[in-house]
A protein has these predicted regions:
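Charged catalytic cores and adjacent phosphate/nucleic-acid-binding surfaces used
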Residues: 1-6, 10, 20-26, 89-103, ...
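Short beta->alpha connector loops
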Residues: 86-88, 110-113, 134-138
């Protein structure tokens, strides 16, 4: 089996993260991971990227954490993939199989369009979407928002749901599992890691190596993904 982290943040792109992309790559390699997906918060959430720059420059800065992790990963033998954590009304969605060029070409879609228009376009053009921690409760989340017909999978285990910041309540994961089962949505998992101290054996196991994000989607669709419980470090 192969182990991957599907949900992590870097200090280059997310204000809530405190470890760089390169540091994250080294730490995950040391922890026995075969690869990671860098999913920094986009501009509608906790981004480090200034608002007053040209769009293309903003995207360049946004991708720095991933690019630094990728460079380090190539040196140490860790596969590194790109993702985006996109937010609407406090609900977070992990977008995969899109790249920097696509982000640069879709400012309107990412910043102004209705969320279902974005989701539809992402999926229609080869990307896929995982609803991250759908039942998390926090001060910045005004209400629970579910999109069962617009996503490809549900993050049924988010290791960081055990963080006291969110009430330290594992029931959020239990509710996510029930939701996925109710709608017949595939399950996946992620640690939602923000620094190297939070690498807690979360993420996923899959039977086949992921060489590109499409390999992850294929294994999601076949039900081959095993979400890992992990254990949040307080």
């Amino acid at each position: 089996m192969y182990k991957y982290e599907t949900h992590l943040h870097t200090s280059e792109g997310s204000t809530c993260a405190s470890s760089s992309g390169a540091e994250m790559a080294r730490a995950h390699k040391a922890a026995g991971y075969d690869g990671i997906f860098v999913t920094d918060h986009f501009f509608n959430s906790s981004t480090t990227v200034p608002k007053d720059l040209p769009w293309e420059k903003r995207i360049d800065l946004y991708c720095k954490g991933y690019e630094n992790a990728l460079e380090e990963g190539r040196k140490i033998g860790l596969d590194v993939f790109f993702g985006v954590e996109w937010t609407i009304n406090g609900a977070d969605f992990l977008i995969y199989n899109k790249d920097k060029a696509w982000l640069k070409d879709n400012e309107h879609l990412l910043m102004e369009a209705d969320e279902r228009e974005l989701f539809n376009e992402v999926r229609k053009t080869g990307g896929f979407i995982v609803h991250a921690h759908p039942f998390r409760e926090a001060s910045y989340i005004p209400h629970i928002s579910l999109y069962p017909h617009d996503v490809d999978a549900v993050e049924v285990i988010n290791t960081r749901n055990s963080d006291p910041l969110f009430g330290g309540n594992d029931c959020y994961n239990d509710r996510a599992k029930a939701y996925a089962a109710m709608y017949g949505l595939p399950e996946t998992g992620g640690s939602d890691t923000h620094n190297t101290e939070q690498i807690v054996n979360g993420g996923i196991l899959v039977p086949e190596r992921i060489n590109e994000p499409a390999d992850y989607l294929r294994q999601i669709k076949t039900g081959s993904v095993i979400p890992l419980e992990g254990s949040f470090k307080k």
